[in-house]
From Swiss-Prot:
This is Putative manganese efflux pump MntP. The gene is mntP. It comes from Bacillus cereus (strain G9842). Pfam families: Mntp. Its main location: membrane. Probably functions as a manganese efflux pump. GO terms for molecular function: manganese ion transmembrane transporter activity. The chain crosses the membrane at residues 6-26, 37-57, 71-91, 101-121, 131-151, 162-182. It is found in: Cell membrane. It is a multi-pass membrane protein. GO terms for cellular component: plasma membrane. Belongs to the MntP (TC 9.B.29) family. It comes from the Bacteria. InterPro entries: Mntp/YtaF, Put_MntP.
Amino acid sequence: MTFEQLIPLIIMAFALGMDAFSVSLGMGMMPLKLRQILYIGMTIGIFHIIMPFIGMVLGRFLSEKYGDIAHFAGAILLIGLGFYIVYSTILQNGETRTVPIGISLFVFAFGVSIDSFSVGLSLGIYGAQTIITILLFGFVSMLLAWIGLLIGRHAKDMLGTYGEIVGGIILVGFGLYILFPI
């Protein structure tokens, strides 16, 4: 692979990773330990490897209409997760909040990475080099997720008890933006 071929993939990796950054910014406003931030970033990175890989494999066999379904499903997952965070924050009123562990971490990572499935479909149709592409997507998304989580963690301290609600609203807003781009 030449440098000229690598540049578009790097740009695409950052574009996909910005989704992870934006959503992680909101998620970082939850009470997270550094170990949880590490796991969340790694999980997002792994999903950004798995989802485009599946998309690239299926992209050679499926029509382009499934890209719209993946896009829609990712948006709905983010909106649902955002509403859940706002709801649980208001309901629990100062108690320990739900943090993204177990199945909720996988739902979160899946929702953030589902757009990379659509990109994988397109790249599979065009025959992009699979290994380099998916590793680049995973690494950049993991790095940007960590940055977003850490910035969100510090922003939470400035926002006080409303930080988690703001984080949930960011997730809902991002999901709505995916559904209805301006």
